[in-house]
Each structure stands twice: as C-alpha cells, then as structure tokens.
C-alpha cells in the first residue's frame, strides 16, 4: 500500500490534519506522502487559491460569511456546483500524478481534491481511485455531498447532518477528526522555559495559523489580573510585533510554532478561534475552552457543536471574553464538567483508529 494525502493551504487546520494522518501512517510503517493539492499544478494555482481565501477573510470575515451562505444555498439546490466544475478541470493532471507515483489510496483533508477525485472516478476512461475524505469541521461543508469517496471520516453524533445532505450512512466512518497519538502523549510542560511557576495561572490565546482577531481590548484587562498570558500569533507578523511592544513580563508572545501541544498542555485555560482541528487539539489535551473570533460560516457551526455539548463557552464580544475567563477561574466545577465532556465526546485515538481501519480495508 502506498498512500497519498492531499490538502489545501486555506487555513492551517487542513494541513495539520494531513500531517497528523501522515505521522500515524508512518508509525504503522505505511509508505505515504503529503502534498498540497495545488502544488501538483504549479505555483500559480497554489497562490491563486491562497489569495482568494485570504481576500474572503477581509472585513472581519463578512465576505467569507456571504460566500459561505451562498454556497449553502447552491448546495441545497442539488445542481452541479461551480466548485465541482472548477476542480474537475484538474482531473487529468491529478490522475497522471497518482498513476506515475503508484499510489493505491488517497486521503483528502479538503473539499477541492475530493471533488477532483470524484470527477476522475466519474469518467470511465480513468481507472477508479479509492479515496477517503476527512471532514475537519463539526458540520459538513457546502458541496461535500458532491464528493463520492469510499468513506467520509467524521465526528460521531453528526451522522444526521451528513445524511441530510444526501450522503449515504454506509459511507460514514465516525472515528473523529484525526489528531495524532504523539501530539497528545508527547505534550509536555514548558513553563520553566518561560519562567512560569507551577502556581501561576496561564491563559493561552490561539488565533489560528494566520493570527486572525483583534485582541487589544482583551489583553489590557487580562494583564491587570496578574496572570500569565501566552498569545500564539501564527504567521501574523504585524500582530507579533504589536504585542511585543507591550513589554510586559506577564505577556508571552509566540509566532508560528510547531509544538502547540506543549503550550496547550502548559496552560490552565485556552481562548481559541473555533477551527475544527484546533478545537479538537485542545479538547484532546483536556483544557477549559472559550471560543472567540469565529470566522462566520463553518467556525460558527464548530462553536455550536462544542457549546451544545458543554465542551466550551462561546464569546461574542470582548466583554464576554473577559467575564467568562473570570467565571472559569472562579468556578472549578464548571471547568471539570467541561473537561469531562471533552473526554466523553472527542476520540483521543482518532488518528490511530483511522489507520487501523485503513489497514483492515485497503491493505
């Protein structure tokens, strides 16, 4: 067996999920490679997809919200979407790439390559390519129903949402959003590296891979609480430089990091954008969680899923963020309940369970 993992650089979660799957496959001695889908078609294609995504995040995500709503509307119409037609254009080159490199199974963590693979399998002049589509959020996205993989990998209890989109129940594998076993078991405390004592409260603020969100209005009030604050800025250099101007010993500013598990493990409370993968990472390490600054659309659904299952608290305003962090700090029982719900609902063995399934069904 030789596995190709395909993602797209539209938000960090899709790529992180792909890397977790690669890591788990490698641990099981399965030959595999991970590549950005658009890298197969050249730098221009990749840059175009990334630029379009970044532009939709403008105006505090309002453009993305409108695009997402339009997508939901078109998806309900059951007509062939422009998204499918666009990705269909890449089928010949993707097919040739897969055949040339002798891949026997493809795993996708993004809609785009899933639609291209579906177009390949719908064309009788090509050999069938078995593939799995990993849903990295807590709601099926628009046009997901146009993909036709062997299986959709998704979160348990969301079966009805997928079925309502016209996806067959027989294609659902509810092992959960994959987070590698090493991410969880290798997480370690890094408090001593940042001169944080064991008795100090630490708030971790995660703003996504691109550092999305204005946090000035919450940083100042939180610094008055005499607690340590760690902010992960991702690739947002402007935010990184701006926060470093505070020159406050209680504020630790981090750019892009590959050991986010250590920062989650070392914190007492986490404030995070409600990305599907990042929320799963936090819940897998079991931390009280506030969801902040959702990108309207799919992240709204992630917030609802976590909130409805009492795994996080949704904060819509700066005041709610400040009030709720104080609420958690003064209510240990609420934090314990949140953590218990995370343990009950989120599968810590999601990646290893997926690999076991692959070995049983595709080896």
Locations of regions flagged by a protein language model:
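Acidic donor-binding loop of glycosyltransferase active sites
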Residues: 265-275
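A short, well-ordered alpha-helix in the C-terminal region of glycosyltransferases
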Residues: 327, 334-348
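Active-site-proximal region of nucleotide-activated glycan assembly enzymes
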Residues: 124-184
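Conserved N-terminal ligand/cofactor-binding loop architecture of enzyme catalytic domains
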Residues: 20-95
């Amino acid at each position: 067996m030789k596995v190709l993992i395909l993602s797209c650089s539209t938000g960090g979660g899709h790529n992180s999920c792909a890397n977790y799957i690669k890591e788990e496959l490698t641990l099981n001695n399965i030959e595999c490679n991970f590549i950005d889908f658009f890298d197969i078609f050249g730098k221009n294609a990749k840059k175009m997809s990334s630029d379009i995504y970044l532009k939709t995040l403008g105006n505090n995500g309002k453009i993305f919200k409108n695009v997402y709503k339009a997508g939901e509307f078109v998806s309900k119409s059951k007509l062939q979407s422009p998204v499918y037609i666009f990705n269909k254009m890449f089928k010949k080159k993707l097919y040739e790439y897969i055949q040339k490199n002798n891949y026997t199974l493809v795993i996708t963590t993004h809609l785009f390559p899933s639609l291209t693979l579906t177009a390949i399998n719908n064309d009788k002049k090509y050999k069938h390519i078995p593939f799995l589509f990993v849903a990295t959020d807590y709601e099926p996205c628009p046009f997901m129903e146009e993909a036709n993989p062997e299986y959709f990998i998704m979160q348990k209890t969301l079966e009805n949402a997928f079925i309502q989109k016209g996806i067959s129940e027989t294609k659902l594998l509810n092992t959960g959003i994959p987070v590698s076993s090493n991410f969880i078991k290798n997480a370690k405390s890094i408090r001593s590296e940042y001169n944080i004592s064991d008795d100090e409260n630490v708030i971790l603020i995660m703003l996504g891979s691109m550092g999305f969100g204005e946090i000035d209005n919450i940083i100042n009030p939180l610094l008055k609480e005499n607690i340590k604050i760690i902010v992960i800025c991702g690739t947002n250099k402007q935010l990184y430089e701006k926060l470093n101007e505070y020159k406050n010993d209680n504020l630790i500013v981090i750019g892009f990091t590959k050991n986010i598990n250590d920062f989650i493990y070392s914190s007492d409370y986490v404030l995070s954008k409600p990305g599907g993968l990042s929320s799963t990472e936090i819940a897998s390490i079991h931390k009280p969680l506030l969801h902040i600054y959702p990108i309207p659309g799919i992240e709204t659904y992630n917030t609802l899923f976590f909130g409805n299952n009492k795994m996080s608290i949704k904060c819509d305003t700066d005041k709610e963020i400040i009030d709720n962090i104080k609420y958690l700090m003064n209510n240990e029982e609420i934090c314990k309940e949140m953590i218990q719900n995370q343990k009950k609902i989120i599968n810590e063995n999601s990646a290893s369970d997926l690999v076991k399934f692959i070995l049983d069904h595709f080896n």
